[in-house]
Protein backbone atom coordinates (compact mmCIF):
# COMPACT_ATOMS: atom_id res chain seq x y z
CA UNK A 1 0.00 0.00 0.00
CA UNK A 2 1.43 3.39 -1.00
CA UNK A 3 2.14 6.10 1.60
CA UNK A 4 -0.23 8.46 -0.20
CA UNK A 5 -3.02 5.92 -0.06
CA UNK A 6 -2.36 5.21 3.63
CA UNK A 7 -2.71 8.93 4.35
CA UNK A 8 -5.93 9.03 2.32
CA UNK A 9 -7.35 6.03 4.16
CA UNK A 10 -6.44 7.59 7.53
CA UNK A 11 -8.12 10.83 6.53
CA UNK A 12 -11.20 8.86 5.55
CA UNK A 13 -11.30 7.11 8.94
CA UNK A 14 -10.91 10.40 10.80
CA UNK A 15 -13.63 11.93 8.66
CA UNK A 16 -15.91 8.98 9.38
CA UNK A 17 -15.36 9.37 13.14
CA UNK A 18 -16.22 13.04 12.93
CA UNK A 19 -19.36 12.31 10.92
CA UNK A 20 -20.43 9.79 13.52
CA UNK A 21 -20.29 12.51 16.16
CA UNK A 22 -22.10 15.20 14.16
CA UNK A 23 -22.69 15.09 10.42
CA UNK A 24 -22.09 18.39 8.65
CA UNK A 25 -23.20 19.45 5.19
CA UNK A 26 -20.65 18.43 2.58
CA UNK A 27 -18.40 21.06 1.03
CA UNK A 28 -19.15 20.83 -2.70
CA UNK A 29 -16.34 23.12 -3.83
CA UNK A 30 -14.07 20.18 -4.69
CA UNK A 31 -16.67 18.43 -6.85
CA UNK A 32 -16.34 18.41 -10.65
CA UNK A 33 -18.92 19.02 -13.41
CA UNK A 34 -19.16 16.74 -16.43
CA UNK A 35 -21.60 16.85 -19.34
CA UNK A 36 -21.89 14.29 -22.13
CA UNK A 37 -22.61 16.64 -25.04
CA UNK A 38 -23.91 14.41 -27.82
CA UNK A 39 -24.13 15.55 -31.47
CA UNK A 40 -27.50 17.16 -32.08
CA UNK A 41 -28.21 17.40 -28.36
CA UNK A 42 -28.27 20.31 -25.94
CA UNK A 43 -25.51 22.47 -24.38
CA UNK A 44 -23.22 21.59 -21.49
CA UNK A 45 -24.57 21.90 -17.95
CA UNK A 46 -23.84 24.94 -15.80
CA UNK A 47 -23.37 23.99 -12.15
CA UNK A 48 -23.55 27.17 -10.06
CA UNK A 49 -22.10 26.73 -6.57
CA UNK A 50 -23.71 28.90 -3.90
CA UNK A 51 -21.86 30.84 -1.16
CA UNK A 52 -21.00 28.48 1.69
CA UNK A 53 -20.33 25.63 -0.77
CA UNK A 54 -23.14 23.39 0.51
CA UNK A 55 -25.62 23.91 -2.34
CA UNK A 56 -25.38 23.88 -6.12
CA UNK A 57 -27.88 24.53 -8.93
CA UNK A 58 -27.70 23.23 -12.48
CA UNK A 59 -29.18 26.16 -14.38
CA UNK A 60 -29.68 25.15 -18.03
CA UNK A 61 -31.43 22.61 -20.24
CA UNK A 62 -28.42 20.39 -20.87
CA UNK A 63 -27.45 17.00 -22.19
CA UNK A 64 -26.81 14.36 -19.46
CA UNK A 65 -24.83 16.29 -16.86
CA UNK A 66 -23.11 15.23 -13.62
CA UNK A 67 -21.56 16.93 -10.60
CA UNK A 68 -19.10 14.38 -9.17
CA UNK A 69 -17.45 14.17 -5.73
CA UNK A 70 -14.14 12.72 -7.05
CA UNK A 71 -14.02 10.02 -4.34
CA UNK A 72 -13.69 6.36 -5.27
CA UNK A 73 -15.40 5.04 -2.15
CA UNK A 74 -17.63 2.31 -0.79
CA UNK A 75 -19.70 1.51 2.32
CA UNK A 76 -21.37 4.85 2.96
CA UNK A 77 -24.72 6.55 3.51
CA UNK A 78 -25.40 9.90 1.86
CA UNK A 79 -28.52 12.03 2.10
CA UNK A 80 -29.77 15.51 1.31
CA UNK A 81 -32.47 17.53 -0.42
CA UNK A 82 -33.13 18.58 -3.98
CA UNK A 83 -35.85 20.28 -6.02
CA UNK A 84 -36.71 21.83 -9.38
CA UNK A 85 -37.05 25.61 -9.10
CA UNK A 86 -39.15 26.18 -12.21
CA UNK A 87 -42.42 25.14 -13.82
CA UNK A 88 -41.10 25.40 -17.39
CA UNK A 89 -40.01 21.80 -18.01
CA UNK A 90 -40.71 18.18 -17.03
CA UNK A 91 -37.57 16.14 -17.57
CA UNK A 92 -34.95 14.22 -15.56
CA UNK A 93 -33.27 14.94 -12.23
CA UNK A 94 -31.44 12.51 -9.98
CA UNK A 95 -28.14 11.03 -8.81
CA UNK A 96 -25.22 8.92 -10.01
CA UNK A 97 -23.32 6.43 -7.82
CA UNK A 98 -20.76 3.67 -8.23
CA UNK A 99 -19.35 5.92 -10.97
CA UNK A 100 -16.27 4.39 -12.63
CA UNK A 101 -16.10 6.50 -15.77
CA UNK A 102 -18.54 8.19 -18.14
CA UNK A 103 -20.03 4.92 -19.41
CA UNK A 104 -19.99 2.71 -16.28
CA UNK A 105 -22.16 3.66 -13.29
CA UNK A 106 -25.51 3.37 -11.53
CA UNK A 107 -28.12 6.08 -12.04
CA UNK A 108 -31.26 7.15 -10.19
CA UNK A 109 -33.41 9.40 -12.35
CA UNK A 110 -36.88 10.91 -11.94
CA UNK A 111 -39.11 12.08 -14.79
CA UNK A 112 -41.99 14.47 -14.16
CA UNK A 113 -44.11 13.39 -17.14
CA UNK A 114 -44.11 10.69 -19.80
CA UNK A 115 -42.46 11.75 -23.05
CA UNK A 116 -40.97 10.31 -26.21
CA UNK A 117 -37.57 11.51 -27.46
CA UNK A 118 -34.80 10.23 -29.78
CA UNK A 119 -36.86 7.17 -30.65
CA UNK A 120 -37.40 6.01 -27.05
CA UNK A 121 -39.94 6.62 -24.32
CA UNK A 122 -39.60 7.96 -20.80
CA UNK A 123 -42.38 6.94 -18.42
CA UNK A 124 -43.39 9.23 -15.58
CA UNK A 125 -41.65 8.32 -12.34
CA UNK A 126 -38.41 7.04 -10.81
CA UNK A 127 -35.94 4.52 -12.22
CA UNK A 128 -32.65 2.97 -11.12
CA UNK A 129 -30.42 2.04 -14.04
CA UNK A 130 -27.02 0.49 -14.67
CA UNK A 131 -24.76 1.58 -17.52
CA UNK A 132 -21.95 -0.67 -18.77
CA UNK A 133 -19.90 0.62 -21.69
CA UNK A 134 -16.97 -1.16 -23.29
CA UNK A 135 -14.53 1.73 -23.69
CA UNK A 136 -15.26 3.82 -20.59
CA UNK A 137 -16.08 6.84 -22.78
CA UNK A 138 -19.75 7.76 -22.58
CA UNK A 139 -19.68 9.66 -25.87
CA UNK A 140 -18.48 6.48 -27.60
CA UNK A 141 -20.46 3.79 -25.76
CA UNK A 142 -23.72 5.57 -24.93
CA UNK A 143 -26.33 7.72 -26.65
CA UNK A 144 -29.09 10.14 -25.71
CA UNK A 145 -31.49 7.23 -26.17
CA UNK A 146 -29.67 5.15 -23.53
CA UNK A 147 -30.29 7.94 -21.02
CA UNK A 148 -33.87 8.69 -22.08
CA UNK A 149 -35.33 5.17 -22.06
CA UNK A 150 -36.53 4.09 -18.60
CA UNK A 151 -38.93 1.18 -19.14
CA UNK A 152 -36.80 -1.52 -20.80
CA UNK A 153 -33.11 -2.30 -21.25
CA UNK A 154 -31.64 -0.30 -24.11
CA UNK A 155 -28.15 -0.32 -25.59
CA UNK A 156 -25.66 -0.33 -22.71
CA UNK A 157 -28.35 0.58 -20.14
CA UNK A 158 -30.13 -1.95 -17.91
CA UNK A 159 -33.22 -1.13 -15.83
CA UNK A 160 -32.77 -2.37 -12.24
CA UNK A 161 -35.91 -0.99 -10.53
CA UNK A 162 -38.85 1.29 -11.35
CA UNK A 163 -41.57 3.31 -9.66
CA UNK A 164 -43.69 4.45 -12.60
CA UNK A 165 -47.31 5.61 -12.65
CA UNK A 166 -49.46 8.53 -13.75
CA UNK A 167 -48.94 10.11 -10.31
CA UNK A 168 -45.26 9.23 -9.75
CA UNK A 169 -43.68 12.34 -11.27
CA UNK A 170 -41.94 15.08 -9.31
CA UNK A 171 -43.73 18.39 -8.69
CA UNK A 172 -42.48 21.89 -9.45
CA UNK A 173 -40.87 23.82 -6.59
CA UNK A 174 -41.31 20.96 -4.11
CA UNK A 175 -38.44 19.91 -1.82
CA UNK A 176 -37.58 16.20 -1.79
CA UNK A 177 -35.16 14.19 0.37
CA UNK A 178 -32.88 11.50 -1.04
CA UNK A 179 -31.00 8.80 0.89
CA UNK A 180 -28.58 6.22 -0.48
CA UNK A 181 -27.04 3.32 1.43
CA UNK A 182 -24.24 2.14 -0.83
CA UNK A 183 -22.62 -1.26 -0.29
CA UNK A 184 -22.99 -1.23 3.52
CA UNK A 185 -23.74 -4.89 2.90
CA UNK A 186 -21.62 -6.14 -0.02
CA UNK A 187 -23.57 -5.94 -3.26
CA UNK A 188 -26.59 -4.18 -1.74
CA UNK A 189 -27.86 -0.63 -2.34
CA UNK A 190 -30.89 1.04 -0.77
CA UNK A 191 -32.59 4.19 -2.08
CA UNK A 192 -35.21 6.17 -0.18
CA UNK A 193 -37.07 9.21 -1.56
CA UNK A 194 -39.26 11.27 0.75
CA UNK A 195 -41.39 14.40 0.68
CA UNK A 196 -41.43 15.64 4.24
CA UNK A 197 -42.45 12.68 6.39
CA UNK A 198 -44.00 10.80 3.46
CA UNK A 199 -41.93 8.05 1.85
CA UNK A 200 -42.52 8.14 -1.91
CA UNK A 201 -40.27 5.20 -2.75
CA UNK A 202 -37.97 2.84 -0.90
CA UNK A 203 -36.20 0.10 -2.80
CA UNK A 204 -33.27 -2.26 -2.32
CA UNK A 205 -31.06 -3.33 -5.22
CA UNK A 206 -28.85 -6.41 -5.18
CA UNK A 207 -26.08 -5.89 -7.72
CA UNK A 208 -22.32 -6.16 -7.30
CA UNK A 209 -21.15 -4.84 -10.66
CA UNK A 210 -19.78 -1.64 -9.09
CA UNK A 211 -19.00 -1.95 -5.38
CA UNK A 212 -17.12 1.36 -5.18
CA UNK A 213 -17.07 4.57 -7.17
CA UNK A 214 -17.92 8.24 -7.19
CA UNK A 215 -21.22 9.78 -6.12
CA UNK A 216 -22.75 12.78 -7.81
CA UNK A 217 -25.77 14.81 -8.81
CA UNK A 218 -27.39 14.32 -12.22
CA UNK A 219 -29.93 15.84 -14.54
CA UNK A 220 -30.85 15.56 -18.18
CA UNK A 221 -32.72 18.18 -20.24
CA UNK A 222 -33.91 19.85 -17.03
CA UNK A 223 -32.95 23.33 -15.87
CA UNK A 224 -32.96 24.92 -12.42
CA UNK A 225 -32.33 21.81 -10.31
CA UNK A 226 -30.94 22.63 -6.87
CA UNK A 227 -29.12 20.19 -4.52
CA UNK A 228 -28.43 21.24 -0.93
CA UNK A 229 -27.39 20.10 2.54
CA UNK A 230 -25.96 16.70 1.65
CA UNK A 231 -24.38 14.76 4.51
CA UNK A 232 -22.39 11.54 4.49
CA UNK A 233 -21.77 8.88 7.11
CA UNK A 234 -19.13 6.20 6.69
CA UNK A 235 -17.17 5.81 3.51
CA UNK A 236 -14.06 3.77 2.77
CA UNK A 237 -11.71 5.09 0.12
CA UNK A 238 -10.74 2.42 -2.41
CA UNK A 239 -7.35 2.79 -4.07
CA UNK A 240 -7.98 2.68 -7.85
CA UNK A 241 -4.35 1.62 -8.46
CA UNK A 242 -3.38 -0.73 -5.62
CA UNK A 243 0.29 -1.54 -5.13
CA UNK A 244 0.98 -5.33 -5.10
CA UNK A 245 1.48 -6.80 -1.64
CA UNK A 246 5.00 -8.11 -0.77
CA UNK A 247 4.00 -11.72 -1.45
CA UNK A 248 2.76 -10.75 -4.90
CA UNK A 249 5.95 -8.82 -5.55
CA UNK A 250 8.00 -11.87 -4.52
CA UNK A 251 6.08 -14.09 -6.92
CA UNK A 252 6.53 -11.51 -9.65
CA UNK A 253 10.28 -11.47 -8.93
CA UNK A 254 10.50 -15.25 -9.12
CA UNK A 255 8.64 -15.20 -12.40
CA UNK A 256 10.99 -12.63 -13.88
CA UNK A 257 14.02 -14.58 -12.62
CA UNK A 258 12.68 -17.75 -14.21
CA UNK A 259 12.11 -15.94 -17.49
CA UNK A 260 15.68 -14.60 -17.43
CA UNK A 261 17.09 -18.10 -16.75
CA UNK A 262 15.07 -19.53 -19.62
CA UNK A 263 16.41 -16.87 -21.94
CA UNK A 264 20.00 -17.64 -20.83
CA UNK A 265 19.51 -21.37 -21.46
CA UNK A 266 18.06 -20.62 -24.89
CA UNK A 267 21.02 -18.39 -25.66
CA UNK A 268 23.51 -21.05 -24.52
CA UNK A 269 21.80 -23.73 -26.59
CA UNK A 270 22.10 -21.63 -29.69
List each language-model region with its residue ranges.
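Extracellular glycan-recognition regions
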Residues: 24-242
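A short, hydrophobic C-terminal helix/tail in secreted or cell-surface proteins
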Residues: 244-262
